[in-house]
Each structure stands twice: as C-alpha cells, then as structure tokens.
C-alpha cells in the first residue's frame, strides 16, 4: 500500500517559501499591472482585498484550530466512528445554507445561469472521486493542505503549488468544463458540458491515483 510516512522537522526556510511567494503575488496583484485578472464572469467576482484578508485569516484560524478536513472527516467517521470533524463540516454547511436562504442567493439546481455547474452527473461524481482519492493519498483535502502549508509544511506547499499548476493547465489546454449560461445574443439557455479532453484527464488522474496507492 501507500503511506506518506511520519512528519519530521526540516529547516524553517522551506516552510516559509510558500507564504513569501503568496505575499509576493499579493503585492504584484495590488501594486502592478503585471498579473491579469478576469473583467467579467465568475472570475471577476470577489470581495474587497482587505475584507478578503481579514475573512481569510479568521476562517483560516478556525480551520487550523478545529483541524477541519473534508477527507479526514469522512475517514474518521468510517474507520474510527469519530464524528467530530464531520460535525464541523455539517455545521459549516448549515450556516452557509441559512446565509444563502436569508440573502436570497440559494439556488437548487445545476442548469441555472450564474451557477458554475453542469448536469452531467457521471463526470461530476468521477471528478470529485479523483479529488477525494488524491486527498486521501495526500493526507488531507485541499483546504487542509492549504492550512498545513501556512503552518510550514513543505509537502503541503508542494501540493498547493500543484493545484495552482493544474488549474492553469485546465484553463489553457481545454480541460475545464463549462457551466450553464445564457447566450447574450440569442437569449437561449446553453447547458454546461464536459470537454473531451477533460474526460480523458479525469480518467488519467484516477488511474494515476490507483497506481500510486497500490
């Protein structure tokens, strides 16, 4: 089988690489025009930077103290009958559900303009299966990896950088799926779809996870 092995201490400089890199990207994004940003669509929607930083620090501190992890919560519930982590995730879901209902932003469905989703459920399931499989092998979900990277874990830092790199590959090589949207010219509803390249990439990722695991 596969095992990450025990964590061990290393030099402090390696743990500071990712935080320093993220700080550099923040400075470039706010003080220069070197980095490009979306001017329309979901990628252009974000809170003011100060609010984002404050909210991120608060949520990050809570996630770190509670050891929040989606993969870990399911693992503990199944293997150890411990529902502590799963209770935290369920609580987060309930809070966000109430917030969205109260603000009128709750939408039940997939084929809805403005919602980044599609109704090709087989590939929704396979895509999240690949993510969950990789999270188990890596020792934590993407959120947990981000928290550990902030704590100074160089392994998690490499994982986070890998997620950035993979996101860039998806959007530059036609791997990313499209969400349901309204055609601005005809007014017709255009259903989201999974790209052929994305399907191939998903299958390759699942096969790679099986090879690593066994």
Tell me the role of every PLM-derived stretch:
Residues 1-214:
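Membrane-interfacial helix-loop segments of redox and metal-homeostasis proteins
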């Amino acid at each position: 089988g596969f095992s990450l092995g025990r964590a061990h201490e290393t030099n402090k400089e390696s743990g500071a690489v990712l935080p320093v890199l993220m700080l550099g990207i923040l400075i470039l994004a706010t003080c220069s025009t070197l980095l490009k940003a979306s001017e329309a669509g979901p990628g252009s929607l974000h809170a003011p930077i100060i609010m984002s930083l404050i909210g991120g620090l608060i949520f990050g501190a809570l996630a770190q103290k509670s050891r929040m992890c989606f993969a870990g919560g399911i693992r503990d519930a199944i293997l150890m009958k411990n529902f502590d982590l799963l209770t935290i995730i369920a609580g987060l879901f309930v809070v966000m559900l109430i917030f969205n209902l109260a603000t009128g932003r709750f939408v039940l469905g997939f084929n809805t303009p403005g919602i980044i989703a599609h109704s090709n459920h087989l590939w929704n399931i396979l895509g999240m299966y690949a993510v969950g499989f990789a999270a188990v092998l890596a020792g934590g979900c993407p959120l947990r990896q981000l928290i550990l990277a902030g704590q100074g874990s160089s392994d998690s830092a490499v994982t986070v950088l890998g997620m950035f790199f993979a996101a860039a590959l998806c959007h530059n090589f036609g791997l990313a799926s499209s969400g349901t949207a309204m055609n601005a010219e005809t007014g017709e509803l255009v259903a989201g779809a999974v790209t052929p390249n994305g399907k191939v990439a998903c299958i390759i990722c699942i096969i790679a996870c099986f090879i690593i695991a066994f």
